[in-house]
């Protein structure tokens, strides 16, 4: 039976960093008209930790009356079996792929904890990514415009157009230092490009979204508010897109794109080399 629900709780559970679970989960969920309420549980390596995750799943099921979606990667059989008994739809993100490779190459897999590369083995890469994540978090949502010289990409757009998840994905997966700046309702009255951005035009990239989709997302956050109204969404988007065109800032519509697709298009347009971190 099809359940017409615009939102669903989604859990990413792993005995490692959970980055693989999140990445594959985002790709899959991007195929559906769904607003995921996401929670991530990395380093679930003991029965106590998985018990805590199961409690969260049970709370979600009891509250919403529908089973949440769980994307997981767990090696220890006992922990895996505990998780599979939870009231959720569970998806092992590696199982079908590993089985197919095993059949094709006729070799038994040797499961191991899904750790990232060790710091000692690849310390420069590790610390580059940590620095990129810290920089991106410090420059999220217009918190500060200091240190723009260090930025690789500067994302511009209205609130809830996908800037934060895209910024963090770029930092975590590609080690890019990303600034994201939101245009708010007050900016619409006198829309202009901030002086701080003038000398960094080559780093600017705009994100826009369909007004209907923006209204849906904002209603889920602040239902009935002027901020979420269709009229306000359309006004903000029209004004910001006019700025992008006037200032020759490249931009894309994120309405039907996953963060992975958004990132790929930005990197291609910016001519930047992909440096995927494991």
Swiss-Prot record:
Cysteine disulfide partners in this protein: none
NCBIfam families in alphabetical order: PRK05339.1
Protein origin, superkingdom: Bacteria
Family designation: Belongs to the pyruvate, phosphate/water dikinase regulatory protein family. PSRP subfamily.
Enzyme class, spelled out: transferase
Keywords carried by this UniProt record: Kinase, Nucleotide-binding, Serine/threonine-protein kinase, Transferase
Residue ranges the record marks as coiled coil: none
GO molecular function: ADP binding; ATP binding; phosphotransferase activity, phosphate group as acceptor; protein serine/threonine kinase activity
Function according to Swiss-Prot or TrEMBL: Bifunctional serine/threonine kinase and phosphorylase involved in the regulation of the phosphoenolpyruvate synthase (PEPS) by catalyzing its phosphorylation/dephosphorylation.
UniProt catalytic activity: [pyruvate, water dikinase] + ADP = [pyruvate, water dikinase]-phosphate + AMP + H(+); [pyruvate, water dikinase]-phosphate + phosphate + H(+) = [pyruvate, water dikinase] + diphosphate
UniProt EC number: 2.7.11.33, 2.7.4.28
Protein name: Putative phosphoenolpyruvate synthase regulatory protein
InterPro entries per UniProt: Kinase-pyrophosphorylase, PSRP
Residues annotated for ADP binding in this entry: 157-164
